[in-house]
Design a protein with these regions (language model features):
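SAM-dependent methyltransferase catalytic region
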Residues: 1-106, 112-116, 125, 129-138
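C-terminal substrate-recognition regions of SAM-dependent nucleic acid methyltransferases
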Residues: 31, 35, 113-340
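Flexible loop/turn segments at secondary-structure boundaries
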Residues: 49, 85-86, 244-246, 353
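A generic structural-conservation signal
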Residues: 77, 342-345
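Short, amphipathic C-terminal "tail helix"
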Residues: 344-355
Length: 355
């Protein structure tokens, strides 16, 4: 979608009454039409060209969905990005309303947008839904991945976010049933040391700065945030996921995490990176890193990380472990009593990484 200004002064002077953005900016869309709608079908603009790059563009599609619902049609069906399942800028209230709306009778999901729109990469995949005014009940959900369709009748609001893979539901329920503290309680927010992405090293300094082009010196007196972490062994991961636009590789598998390394004491980083843990012990930091590299952990992160961004929220299903020891996938599968089928599902979705 383009901003209204992009349509030009001439178009505005001619009074383009059907301009899409008039529809989403009115409190009562019924006033725009002299008729009632029994059926509304659409593929709305996905984002607003706000003058920045694609990463900063604001989602727009949810506004069309919300306004269309206000028209109270008998049936509403729209094709929209699937990022709303667990992320997206400004989509929290939309996600809550969608997951709690029992009038959504069907939801069809495509992990890869190219299965729906050949040649088109849409971060997090694509979906379409059927909303029925007179319906109230569970949703008939279908996920399409690697040419396979998995169907499940379910309530959409089991969690605060939506789990797209039916096979993952059982795995997550086994893990969450133990009520263990999860890693989202320790993973840093963006800018763990208060440094934006465009910060570069200085000519001199007591610290070593890790930034997107390498490392360099940085003055300690410029660090205000995260000073208590400077002398820790820190586990650093990239804010961007490994997958281009959140899409799987050609084999349909995900690596999930990209750059991962340990920052020793006196090393810091910009907001290009997050800290996934830290310790006074190098060995414990190494064990945290090994845990992050397991397929088990990256699978759980992938259930929330449906786009190209990794945030602390993506670790909400990842249980904390005793990091005085290293963990293997086999030990984790046994600890959480995963079945052979559940293990195969994880193994076939997540690419291996060297430990």
């Amino acid at each position: 979608g383009a901003s209204q200004a992009a349509y030009g002064e001439q178009a505005r002077q001619e009074g383009l009454e059907s301009h899409a953005y008039e529809f989403i900016h009115t409190n009562n869309p019924n006033n725009l039409f002299s008729m009632n709608f029994d059926v509304i079908i659409g593929n709305p603009p996905y984002q607003l060209d706000d003058g920045g790059n694609g990463a900063s563009a604001k989602p727009l599609y949810h506004l069309f969905v919300e306004q269309a619902m206000k028209l109270k049609p008998k049936y509403l069906s729209m094709v929209i990005p699937a990022r709303w399942y667990s992320g997206g800028k400004g989509l929290a209230s939309f996600r809550f309303s969608m997951l709690n709306d029992e009038r959504i009778s069907k939801l069809i999901d495509y992990t890869s947008s190219e299965d729906c729109f050949p040649g088109v990469d849409i971060a997090g995949g694509i979906c379409y839904f059927l909303w029925e005014r007179e319906y109230s009940g569970q949703c008939n959900y279908t996920n399409n991945r690697n040419g396979k369709r998995n169907n499940l009748i379910k309530s959409l609001n089991e969690y605060k976010i939506f789990i797209r893979y039916p096979a993952a539901d059982g795995i997550i329920k086994k893990i969450t049933s133990l009520n263990e503290t999860c890693m989202n309680t320790i993973v840093s927010t963006r800018k763990p040391f208060g440094l934006e992405t465009n910060v570069v090293p200085s000519c001199s300094g007591e610290l070593t700065l890790r930034y997107n082009k390498g490392t360099g010196k940085y003055p300690a007196d410029k660090i205000i945030v995260g000073r208590d972490l400077i002398n820790k062994w820190k586990v650093m991961i990239s804010y961007l996921s490994s997958e281009h636009a959140g899409q799987p590789d050609k084999s349909g598998m995900f690596r999930v995490l990209s750059t991962m390394e340990i920052l020793p004491p006196t090393h810091i980083c910009t907001e290009t990176y997050l800290l996934a843990g830290w310790s006074d012990s190098k060995e414990e930091a190494e064990n945290i890193l090994k845990y992050l590299k397991t397929k088990f952990t990256r699978f759980l992160i992938a259930q929330i990380a449906v786009s190209q961004h990794i945030t602390r929220n993506c670790f909400s299903f990842v249980p904390l472990q005793d990091f005085s020891k290293a963990w293997t996938d086999e030990e984790l599968y046994a600890k959480y009593a995963l079945t052979k089928e559940e293990i195969e599902f994880i193994e076939n979705m997540i690419r291996p990484m060297e430990s």
